[in-house]
């Protein structure tokens, strides 16, 4: 079985695949102070609850946008699963796509993994919107090349910034307001963020298509993707497991060392 690890700025997602079958998926908060042993004991217990044996995991792959997490996650794989993990972005790891950027080394691993999965399962040209700590818009052409994109602050990050920077604005949860014109502070904040982001999505998608010069499939992933897909017609498809499926595909493209 394969252990796929998606380490983001806010959460780490651990998933176990048996072939194409997703056997389990768990989340932990991203914390570079947490040791490999803490994560290992926690994950081993969750595997046991699902009826899985950690020793049946023979390979692992890691994508991380937090460099400080990589060492601990590699140690976790070696110590608890007796395997040397592939790390997206390491030299020699074949993604199966060309990165058509001036500085390809700067692209986040999660964005590249999403591009791999999007091209594999949906073809192109397409736009991938990932609603995470940042909201990213990534362009993949019909040949599977990664062409770049746009990065904006994530929804929850924007809400937190409002609360932290303005003394009288409270911390609020994201939600779809019943109306655009808020009649109190909280609904006004929710309206500004929610409908503002709908406008952001629609505006960027329109401009990307115009610049790219063709119609494109728009695919959304991330926890808030369903909420925004209901509010705009520009999103054509949702895929909650896009990043994990991208990790699975990259693992298949690369020879994985035999467990020691």
Swiss-Prot record:
| CDD domains tied to this protein | ASKHA_NBD_PanK-III
Q: Which residues bind ATP?
A: 6-13, 133
- Per its record, what are the GO molecular function terms? ATP binding; metal ion binding; pantothenate kinase activity
Top EC class of this enzyme = transferase
The GO cellular component terms are: cytoplasm
Q: What positions constitute the catalytic site?
A: 110 (proton acceptor)
Taxonomy, superkingdom: Bacteria
Q: What is this protein called?
A: Type III pantothenate kinase
